[in-house]
Curated annotation (Swiss-Prot):
Its EC number is 2.7.1.144. PANTHER family: 1-PHOSPHOFRUCTOKINASE, 1-PHOSPHOFRUCTOKINASE-RELATED. Pfam families: PfkB. Pathway: Carbohydrate metabolism; D-tagatose 6-phosphate degradation; D-glyceraldehyde 3-phosphate and glycerone phosphate from D-tagatose 6-phosphate: step 1/2. Belongs to the carbohydrate kinase PfkB family. LacC subfamily. Keywords: ATP-binding, Kinase, Lactose metabolism, Nucleotide-binding, Transferase. HAMAP family: LacC. Signal peptide: none annotated. It catalyses: D-tagatofuranose 6-phosphate + ATP = D-tagatofuranose 1,6-bisphosphate + ADP + H(+). One of its GO terms (biological process) is D-tagatose 6-phosphate catabolic process. This is Tagatose-6-phosphate kinase. The gene is lacC.
Length: 310
């Protein structure tokens, strides 16, 4: 069983418009409302590839119940921790080939709720074999909250796949308890190191070998359409991917995380892990719906990916 954590989920509302008129009335014919958040995208893809998965995090109010009901309808198991605050909305206005987003900050978690979730998580940890943590921390939580979670996973021998960025990731990496896998994109990698972006192979090797990453088993760096670069213990890999027709790249990173987590759960070798992860990321990009993959195209893309030890 895989446990996914989305500590700041949202109801994602999509408004498609022919054109966005500022300071005027805009009427929409169709509205899409989904259970959103990076970890829930990971959850959906894991469910689609047939992995046993359980979703958790904080939810509150009517919007929180909306998320729970959406997962129920999809047949996805969940064990959220209820809070006093209201789960947030995130609005995307799709217009003229562009996407304008309005993102609510979300509820503030108080100390009692923060401590309560840790106890809740410890109970869930007893019955899972891998944990995938995705996205930002909600307001009110200490910057080391993910580190507290990872410490408990390490004590139980449960691998952690972590997808976050900025100060939150920095705090985790400065903690003695490390995640098994991190997945920064190339910009996030160099921002962590406070270095100018450099896509050369030697620079990437030096970057992921910095002391900050010591103890992290897998570092998988997304290079967008150029594929990926990875370090597993002391081995480096370059992942070359085919050119595809991209319909919606949103959620592709989350689908990649789903692939990594699935491969970790099933103890797959390095080559298959990297190919599975990138295949699922590309499959998501080919679909209009975020966090959805068409597995009919899986084998074709999987066989086109080239993984080289460098």
């Amino acid at each position: 069983m895989i446990l996914t954590l989305t500590l700041n989920p949202s109801v994602d509302i999509s408004y498609p418009l022919t054109a966005l008129k500022l300071d005027d009335v805009n009427r929409v014919q169709e509205v899409s409302k989904t259970a959103g958040g990076k970890g829930l995208n990971v959850t959906r893809v894991l469910a689609q590839v047939g992995e046993p998965v359980l979703a958790s995090g904080f939810i509150g109010g009517e919007l929180g119940q909306f998320i729970a009901k959406k997962l129920d309808l999809a047949g996805i198991k969940h064990a959220f921790y209820n809070i006093k605050g209201e789960t947030r909305n995130c609005i995307a206005i799709l217009h003229e080939g562009q996407q304008t987003e309005i993102l609510e900050q979300g509820p503030e978690i108080d100390n009692q709720e923060a401590a309560g979730f840790i106890k809740h998580f410890e109970q869930l940890l007893e019955k899972v074999e891998a944990v995938a943590i995705s996205g930002s921390l909600p307001k009110g939580l200490n910057q080391d909250y993910y580190a507290q979670i990872i410490e408990r996973c390490q004590n139980k021998g449960v691998p952690v796949i972590l997808d976050c960025s900025g100060a939150t990731l920095q705090t985790v990496l400065e903690n003695p308890y490390k995640p098994t896998v991190i997945k920064p994109n190339i910009s996030e990698l160099y921002q962590l190191l406070n270095q100018p972006l450099d896509e050369s192979l030697e620079s990437l090797k030096q970057a992921v070998s910095q002391p900050l990453f010591e103890g992290v088993e897998w570092i998988i760096v997304s290079l967008g359409a150029q594929g990926a670069f990875a370090k597993h213990n002391h081995t480096f890999y370059r992942v070359n991917i085919p050119t595809i027709s991209v319909l919606n790249p949103v959620g592709s990173g989350d689908s990649t995380v789903a692939g990594i987590t699935s491969a970790i759960l099933n103890h797959e070798n390095d080559l298959d892990l990297l190919k599975k992860a990138n295949t699922l990321g590309m499959l998501n990009a080919q679909e209009a719906q975020t966090g959805y993959v068409n597995l009919n195209n899986y084998d074709d893309l999987f066989n086109q990916i080239e993984v080289l030890e460098v």
